[in-house]
């Protein structure tokens, strides 16, 4: 109504879906960062992240490898978000763990989920690799991360800890 103050709540945490930075001059895409180089580069789009990014209205998908984005540049982008979903692979896992540390340095309260092949095959080891990883999703993650983004905002509007 005109002239009436209204409170509008976001439907979910502001979420960044991230295909993280790759290695310099390394090839990658389709959910992997290959430990090899070629004469030409080819990057598949981050298809796995498109569905959940499309479902949450206040989210963004950032495909870092084709942009040649560094971890520093990525952390600067991530500081504007409350929740980051990192699609990790086996070859890039340790680099992604270091990125998670950088994200927490920039914004300590940010929530970080790791998804993808590495956490699927090594869930316990992945979760124990760093305290900076808040949780992992072992299987199909698209609905799980959307549900977390929506429910966490309702359960912890002022921030807080999710046990698990």
Model-derived features with residue positions:
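A detector of low-complexity, intrinsically disordered, Ser/Thr/Gly/Pro/Ala-rich segments
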Residues: 11-13, 159-160
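Short glycine-rich His-centered loop
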Residues: 13-43
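Glycine-rich beta-alpha loop elements in corrinoid/cobalamin-binding modules
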Residues: 48, 52-164
């Amino acid at each position: 109504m005109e002239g009436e103050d209204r409170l509008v709540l976001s439907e979910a945490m502001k979420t960044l879906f991230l295909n993280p930075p790759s290695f310099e001059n390394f090839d990658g895409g389709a959910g992997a960062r290959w430990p090899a180089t070629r004469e030409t580069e080819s990057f598949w789009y981050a298809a796995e992240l498109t569905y959940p990014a499309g479902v949450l209205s206040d989210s963004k998908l950032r495909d870092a490898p084709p942009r040649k984005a560094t971890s520093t540049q990525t952390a600067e982008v991530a500081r504007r978000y409350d929740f980051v979903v990192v699609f990790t692979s086996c070859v890039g896992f340790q680099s992604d763990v270091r990125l998670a540390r950088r994200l927490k340095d920039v914004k300590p309260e940010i929530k970080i989920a790791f998804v993808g092949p590495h956490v699927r095959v090594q869930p316990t080891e992945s979760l124990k690799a760093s305290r900076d990883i808040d949780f992992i999703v072992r299987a199909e993650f698209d609905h799980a991360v959307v549900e977390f983004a929506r429910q966490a905002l309702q359960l912890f509007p002022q921030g807080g800890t999710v046990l698990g």
